[in-house]
């Protein structure tokens, strides 16, 4: 069939769109703003024939540009007509010079093609599609499609000059149709003139003769096979052409074949950009757009699995009704396929496509390229009319069997040129999958549910002071401030302050004291003139008044805090006094406790005689003061006397926690009365009998941290229990405060969780807020010697003060209680997956390591770490990850771990099972850290759900077992 006298042959090189794994990934309507990738035009040949009446074949015209309503349309009777070819057709009739010229012409335009946005498509076109022909029955619609005519036979354009360049300037629109959609689509086949009303037999012959023949790069064929196929192709061409015709229309052009890399640029974009660009996607299109970027054959237990059954497109509604024999249909030979009715041929192709799509990684696609056409219908329409002429038609069928050669697959012949990183990833996946098939899933040994603790008995864990070294003589130094007379320090005696007389420093390196001479306050004299007066004198005058009602206390506090008279709220204090306390308790409060508190507060210049340094960031400094001095400072905090500590934002102390108790007095929270009970218990105790001990506050800032990947230290011992508490059962150990970076958190406001509770029952911790700047990532605060004054029950809203507590812990040589508390602040994670990011895990490791490390102290002199679910709860941390991080940090610091799960018996068993699993296999800190990194890379980095499918501990079990099995297998092969 020639082009006819009315049309001079023109040369045209159609291009194939970038292949993706999703059938709809190349749909121009659904996924705009895509860039196409093309390869060497030598990769494939294609043959086209153009009907004589085609308007695109007018002499002097290169073809219709995008948007033309008269683009070329190919005739196609059935989907199986594309599968009737036997073997692979090749014809190299062009000379070497012609090929070089063509390649140069094609390659010159490849860069411009890549720069264009391939899917520059307006979403509105989806709404302007042609209306469906709904008046026909489903049978007529299906038959009409399957028996449709091709309105333009495929031929080669043979015009020279700039025809090809002009055609390539207009970017073709691309729509991908999968086989199940072919069975439902009803393409308008209106002929251009009567010359195209051929019979069905002629259509079949034309379809077989003028099919697009693609030179497939992966076909490993000899030169003789190629020559034989070339001869066969020429023979077919001579049969179909007139004897006098030069067969020029049967010559083949080379086109660009895009390798079907599973991780190509377009494929990787489809998942993320498809739903965003088209909010009006149909059900089927949305499903296609969300298909995985790559597919692989792997075991379900693999941590790198992609569940294609959830992401890939499922059967359409029409197919679901006609697929009861889905798994029983097989492809026959090409002759059997040709003899089947076209409807069953389409169904066979559909079934084979879906079967292979779910099990194979290779891909072949049916891919249509359109040039022109003003409207496109949805991909899931039963009858889709495509107005205009289709100028190029490329068909790519995913996972269909080779249609010409029995028992061969078309994917065996398609070129695949994956990127280097794709190849590495596929190699790793293959290795991982093979390993996984051999390794049974590890199941931790069964643990009795009756066990209340697991691991090393707590009696064997080291405690202070028995494990500690003898302390040196207490004396002040450049990095240690001591506020008492060390030469007069005696057990059971109240330490004497040092120096004897008050020394004042009003600068940015020390706490600004209420009794400072620089603490001035504007006052009015008898003449009404304002002058600067001593605020300390005003404080003394206000507090020395008797308090019989809560209103009296409120007025006294506001007298020297006039600026906050309309801002501060005393509702909680008033309700506590009037509604919570009984009459006798209220009377004891205002007759005894409050006057004693005023007395110790106003004795501040005589008790705290030395300026208190600020523990700023990057400082390694300690402050040792007496419990009496702390009591005086806390009494001043209760009466809100500390200057410059109430302003917010960019004030002088904005990087320090609140110290004045004004926020404790506000609101109607049910927590406030219990907090006030706990604090008044402390003040009653210290005013009735002066405490005799010392307390040391140490800010520790580290610069050098372990290289966690290379840390070869083994894991230390573990005791884990769901009973008990850190403060009760961790006596003599390093007790972890799950701190806020502003130490104390909400202790002076509404907070009432682990840190706030600890600061309430050990109120001497609260004074650290006076001089401790916000903690940096490499810093911690260590407090040694605080005393517990109260017992409690509950937690948060259920917290209740129970009774006064007599602390029976021993004292060291510095007269400090052997209670060492370390405040380490965890990160706050709003997204669960964020905590598995390597930088975040490293930060948490460094923070815990900073709190656990004691430079210069050997491991046998270090007590065990008593800790629990640090950074969990409101901070969003995963308890199992945090437990592992603390175990690693303690091992690096050479400390044992006593872990309290606070009633969670399942967590207790999980932590113990993981610890025993790692220690039995002699894994080091670095080994476990690498597993954490691997978990992030394989499970969390590309996770699109709130949490990974595989949890951390099962992943570690499997990874370690897989590695051990691989090592054993390698040893057996090498004979070692």
From Swiss-Prot:
Annotated GO biological process: ATP generation from poly-ADP-D-ribose; base-excision repair, gap-filling; carbohydrate metabolic process; nucleotide-sugar metabolic process; regulation of DNA repair
Residue ranges of the motif Nuclear localization signal: 10-16
Top EC class of this enzyme: hydrolase
Compositionally biased spans, kind Basic and acidic residues: 37-46, 191-206, 222-233
Residue ranges, compositional bias (Polar residues): 332-342
Short motif (PIP-box (PCNA interacting peptide)): ranges: 76-83
Effect of residue 740 to A: Reduced poly(ADP-ribose) glycohydrolase activity
GO CC term, one of those recorded: cytosol
InterPro entries reported in the protein's UniProt record: PARG_cat_C (IPR046372), PARG_helical (IPR048362), Poly_GlycHdrlase (IPR007724)
Keywords: Acetylation, Cytoplasm, DNA damage, Hydrolase, Mitochondrion, Nucleus, Phosphoprotein
Annotated spans, A-domain: 1-456
Pfam families assigned: PARG_cat_C, PARG_cat_N
Modified residues (Phosphothreonine): 139, 199
GO MF term list: poly(ADP-ribose) glycohydrolase activity
Binding-site positions, substrate: 726-727, 740, 754, 795, 869-874
Oligomeric and partner information: Interacts with PCNA. Interacts with NUDT5.
Free-text function comment from the UniProt entry: Poly(ADP-ribose) glycohydrolase that degrades poly(ADP-ribose) by hydrolyzing the ribose-ribose bonds present in poly(ADP-ribose). PARG acts both as an endo- and exoglycosidase, releasing poly(ADP-ribose) of different length as well as ADP-ribose monomers. It is however unable to cleave the ester bond between the terminal ADP-ribose and ADP-ribosylated residues, leaving proteins that are mono-ADP-ribosylated. Poly(ADP-ribose) is synthesized after DNA damage is only present transiently and is rapidly degraded by PARG.
Family, similarity comment: Belongs to the poly(ADP-ribose) glycohydrolase family.
Protein name per UniProt: Poly(ADP-ribose) glycohydrolase
Species for this entry: Homo sapiens (Human)
Gene name of the record: PARG
